[in-house]
Amino acid sequence: MIDKEYQRIMTERTASAPRAKKSLGQNFLQDKNISAKIVAALQIGPADCVIEIGPGPGALTDFIQKAAPASLWLLEKDTYWAGEHRRSDSRTPVEKQVVLTDALTFPWERLSDDRSWKLIGNLPYNVASPLMWDCLSLAAFSRAVFMIQKEVGDRIVAAPRSRQYGALSVWLQSHTVPRKELIVPPTVFKPRPKVDSAVLSFAPLPLSARNFSPGALSVLLKICFQQRRKQLQKILKRYWSDAVCGWFEQQGLPPAARPEELSPNQFQQLANLLESQLVS
């Protein structure tokens, strides 16, 4: 149920603003309870450094500031909303930085692991997949919570041999433990999207559990899932060898297996094997 006072505040903030930009995938959340649940799922502590992607009118930002993290970075591509957040700096005790940038080009790999980084955002549908592919594999973060299109969320948590299982499933499950937190209907946004959204949390896997070459895995996934209905032996015919054949036998997989039949761990092993062949 939408909180009328909260909706009034959000409406006031957007009344004098330019219209939501379709090119930026802007759909502004209007529900106080859902905003609170999304931020609560991030489990913010006093030592955390929070990065919010695309804060817009601040539906999540207000709750993040109330949670009192050590610092808050706002990554905003829209010049209007970046300016609004800069003007509001003096109204909060939380150390806040507003960065006018495209999160797709942000240097996630430069986040130092000596700080507790937490990532959050209502991600635009049109960039959510490539953005999560990068930031959840490159950034040294301790937790992330994103609201995305429900269909994309279903793909992320999908299991092998399911219709939704694909490259994004394997990649993110190789770097994180994703969990679906809640489903959000279109009615709580302005303008309304045409589909449901899902809120997912991500806990990073320890480095000891990521014993694979990210570059090799990324290439392998893109090759395999571009031809997901073909047999792996045919997809990988350029790289097929006695060692690869032996690996399939060891895993109990026939050469006729298709990409969706391999688990994330099996893709990691296969990527390492293929890379070792190429460099030997």
Curated annotation (Swiss-Prot):
Catalysed reactions, semicolon-separated: adenosine(1518)/adenosine(1519) in 16S rRNA + 4 S-adenosyl-L-methionine = N(6)-dimethyladenosine(1518)/N(6)-dimethyladenosine(1519) in 16S rRNA + 4 S-adenosyl-L-homocysteine + 4 H(+)
Protein name, entry field: Ribosomal RNA small subunit methyltransferase A
InterPro entries given in the database record: KsgA/Erm, rRNA_Ade_diMease-like_C, rRNA_Ade_Mease_Trfase_CS, rRNA_Ade_methylase_Trfase_N, rRNA_adenine_dimethylase, SAM-dependent_MTases_sf
GO molecular function: 16S rRNA (adenine(1518)-N(6)/adenine(1519)-N(6))-dimethyltransferase activity; RNA binding
Function: Specifically dimethylates two adjacent adenosines (A1518 and A1519) in the loop of a conserved hairpin near the 3'-end of 16S rRNA in the 30S particle. May play a critical role in biogenesis of 30S subunits.
Location(s), subcellular: Cytoplasm
Matches recorded under PANTHER family: DIMETHYLADENOSINE TRANSFERASE, DIMETHYLADENOSINE TRANSFERASE-RELATED
Keyword tags: Cytoplasm, Methyltransferase, RNA-binding, rRNA processing, S-adenosyl-L-methionine, Transferase
Family membership: Belongs to the class I-like SAM-binding methyltransferase superfamily. rRNA adenine N(6)-methyltransferase family. RsmA subfamily.
